[in-house]
């Protein structure tokens, strides 16, 4: 019995059944073929002279696909890489960076030869042939030509330090999700007149689970401005048969790329020979004309390492040995055609491997080869002129489109204006003492306040936990239901494949990177902190590469149901470890964690974090109801004090004795409601500090840090935390203090299930246990009493 897909909004098109006429004339085809020869030759040069580093195979097999996108499909302006209305190309396959850099440099040469007016006026907005001297080089490289030509240090996987690159990619599958996030940002900002996002990836990069999650999200949301280009060469690092093909099972997966995309309601265009420019461009033009309202994938059957001399998986991250016969054979076609003579060494040794100047010799040989390639391109002016004209046409098409933001488009600048000008907590967010609420609910209300002020600049998703984590509040007042590009564009709630923290973080990072939204994702802190970490880290890398000193495009990962008060769910969910994955694990200023204990601290902390414009904000909020304390009556610092990151929660009534540092809401409530009254009953008078954000504290001037939390306090402190012990090491400096610090794993085991108070008691973190621990610690801090000296009778 044959099986088939159920009804789909999308189409599956086999190019060989379309009878599409060849899109290129014989002369045009010759120009594309010449460009590809330059490209394949340059990939061989890059691998040889780095030396022996990079990914030649997939770079070569995707070259013709990318050439079609850049010189035929995209509407963009080479002279203005930052144009927001332009189509985007996004290398989800970050390991094809060699190909990206080679194509960018050759495109720059095409424009330089054919029409220099096409180029950016600022050389920093170009990727020149000379910049290839920086391929996989560190920024502090000092070789002569790198310095002379001010070459860019081109990372092994692409970052936005390179013009026209919007994301950092390379961690498999993350680039797919973040590229889809870019498309989401463009589609929501521009509406139907949206830029297209062309995504480049191979079938190996489709195998991570986060990819299926992201494809499901895009298909469900009818994200029709995505065109996904799959370089299906069947070769990964370890396999030459990744997917099932015909009757042969795949070694990794049992789907073809066409089936995977169509399963998720994507249009599919099947290209039998991805080495044929006529088929490549015909498929791309068909994609441009589809009107199904669904995203599109073009799957090209290719050969990894084609014409390089090494094919399949052997060419993935490896190539010919340095200046070997295989290397020269890979360049033989270009050398014969252009009359080039590449640098070579006499005898059996390589000059670059001898003596202290080897790196300089290698660089000189590389530059010599690049100059010969440049001359070959200059001698082939018809190719440069033909492709240069196509670059000019791409700019003209873009200008004719006159893309503008849709009516009522979100205004992200209003969010940052709001938190900059707000004087204290807005009236509608203020909480009276005695109010019963949750941290998560107040975070939802605070973010909704920002969303209303910005006409919906916050798009929110959750791992099937919208109401449970209170982030549904953020989207209230906009369109009901889930966002859909055509059917429900006013909604602010995203459907991201269901329980999909991994893809959610990736999509939200791309959404933020487009620059017009703040993406908010929510789940249990136990899950979203680890599963969102890779996407958040790549987002921070990309943000800092683009703007080394900030400000950065912000995404928010809500680590909800945090800590031991989620105890009924057991240790799989009530996880103390989540904070340690994020806190202080990013370069300063790129990420900010928030650990409020009192719902009144939510707005001050959120506003302080947003003012700093980090790439990531990660609030840790608990699940159960709490009673808002009367801080003034209790002698506690006001909630606004939390914005310093560390603050003196309770000032001693006298001289003070010992220091206690607290972090996490459950243990803070236990201290305030139970331990503190017992300490005061006994006349014990410690300094009590609370850690509300380690990163906000780090961003204070050094002298302010010393004032807020003097070093002598850390040297005498003990800690009480609902997170893991290492999160206290910064604040508790002595061995004695660390040994006395209370934390969930002090007993050496994962905790059991039960209501929050029971789990706290099991951990020794309830108020009574805190009181006993603090009392005992203060006693150990006190110097022993001086013994009176008694004179012996003989000396009397």
Kindly give the residue locations of the regions a language model identified:
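Thiamine diphosphate
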Residues: 134-165, 174, 178, 188-194, ...
